[in-house]
Amino acid sequence: MEIRVFRHDDFEEVITLWERCDLLRPWNDPEMDIERKLNHDPDLFLVAEVAGEVVGSIMGGYDGHRGAAYYLGVHPDYRGRGIANALISRLEKKLIARGCPKINLMVRGDNDAVISMYEKLEYEMQDSVLLLGKRLIEDQEY
């Protein structure tokens, strides 16, 4: 397995991966999300590759105050092999190198498997907060 920075020729493979991992939502256009990421810290967009196939991804961000991780997904046939842990670990190292003191994650409350995985990596529930959002630019429905 190789963890590397996303390349433009990974585009379709990553979107297919996200579909298989049920990461897509109708209000987020994955092509636009990738294009936006490629314009802002593209080296924090990582993929895991096995035998030439993209089998995992994570999209990281750092705003100078906190780090974040999005679009963590591993192909169902490759789960349980440490790929998600490797992606998170590599992102954490990249964030630490930038001086990032903390990473925050958003996980759906009913996603027990992912919550458990993060807890094994020493992530813990923080103060209960309500996530508010406001769409500034409407994506076309995917």
UniProtKB/Swiss-Prot annotation:
Enzyme Commission (EC) number: 2.3.1.-
Source organism superkingdom: Bacteria
Keyword line: Acyltransferase, Transferase
One Pfam family in the UniProt entry: Acetyltransf_1
Residue intervals of the N-acetyltransferase domain: 1-142
Alphabetical list of Gene3D superfamilies matching this protein: 3.40.630.30
Signal peptide, first to last residue: none
GO terms assigned for molecular function: acyltransferase activity, transferring groups other than amino-acyl groups
CDD domains membership: NAT_SF (cd04301)
HAMAP family for the chain: Acetyltransf_YpeA (MF_01127)
Family named by the database record: Belongs to the acetyltransferase family. YpeA subfamily.
Protein name as annotated: Acetyltransferase SG1711
Record lineage: Bacteria, Pseudomonadati, Pseudomonadota, Gammaproteobacteria, Enterobacterales
